[in-house]
Structures are given as C-alpha cells and as structure tokens.
Amino acid sequence: LKPQEQARIALVTGDLLRRLSLYCALTGIQVRQAEKNVWPLLHSWHAFHKIAQPNHPTLDRFNEEAFRRRLTEAKKNPVLMDGCPTWLEKLGSEQLGEAWPAERAALAWMPKRYLRVNSLKCTREELQAALAKEQVTTIPVEGVDSALQVTSDAALFRTKAFADGWFEQQDAGSQQVAAALEVSPGMRVIDACAGAGGKTLHLAAMMEGKGRLLAMDVEEWKLENLKQRARRAGA
C-alpha cells in the first residue's frame, strides 16, 4: 500500500472505533455485531462523511433512505453522536459531573499527532523541510520548542526522516516533562520508570550525549524496545 493509502486506513479505522456505537446505530446493528458487519459499517462511515462510497458488492444492500432516517434520530442524542457507550456515559457523568459533556465530545475527535525533534541529529526547521519533501506537512507548536504538529495524513514511520532517527512521535504535553527537569550535558540522570523510552530519549538529546543516563523499568521488553529506538536516535 502507498503511504497515503495506509494513512487513510488508519483514519477510517480510528474514527470507526472511537465512535463505534454511533456507526452501529446508523447501520442498524448492535455493537456486538460489528465484527461481522465491517462493510456495512464502512458504507455508513462514508455516507456520514459524505464521501464517495467504495465499489464493493455490499453497496447494493446499503439503504440510503434508512441511513438518513437513523441519522436524523441520532442527531437528537448528543451522547450517541459522540459515539459514547452507555457504561462510559454513566461513569463520566458520575465522576466529572457538568465537565463530562465537554470531555466526552473531545474523546470523539481525531487525536492530533505530534513529533519530537531529535536535536542530536537535526533542528526543527530541518525536520520540517525533510518531511515536506515526503509530503508530510507540519507546523511548530507554540511554547514547545521541540514539537511539531502533523497536519497531513501521512505514514510517518515510512519516511526517511524516521528511519534516520530525526524524530519520535510524542505528545506535546509529554515533551514538556523532560524540559521541566532542566537537565544539562554532563549530568548523571536516572529515569526510574522509562517504559519504552520516549522521555528517556528526550533527556538524552538534552544531555547531548554527555554524562550518564540510566533507564529503568520493571518490564524488560520495554527496555529492549528502548535499545532499538536509542540506536536509531543516535543516543
């Protein structure tokens, strides 16, 4: 598959799963029936977003009139439009009260993608330029000097920039954690809950390869993953 095709699959699948209860309702099935009704769900997704339907034999069985009728009913129910299952609506309302509707709506949005520039290998501007050559568009994140927000649908992990270790995918908020520690080259630093090493690698970049950085975690497989990422990052 081409990178753009991979990105499209990720986009559609992600939205279907985030709002599965909505798309099941629009398709006229129960959530437990979703696995056996993939194509009907895909037809509902395309109709909901007013995108041309894929050419598939199941399209003949897609009832546009029934879909529009279900959509009209769904629009009367904000919980359903957000794709929120009943159990989560109950839990969110109990724990967050009046703040829950805004949180629920946010859960239905497509998550933003952020990159952390590996300063051991490039600058933010150099990474932007390199990604642009591979049809990946980005914008700087205000207040987070190491972050870029991806604004295009692209298969990031097939880019040369990723293979060369120029970036890691990391939430902009997470990038602020390492920055708050104010580490500097030559320090001795311990990351006692390293996981797969996103923040560890950020610390390593801030230390410019000088000093000692010890990564620890109770899960050995995560540290093995970190070793591979560290080699790619040149840390």
Regions found by a protein language model. Give the residues of each.
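Class I Rossmann-like S-adenosyl-L-methionine
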Residues: L1-F157
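Rossmann-like S-adenosyl-L-methionine
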Residues: E125-A235
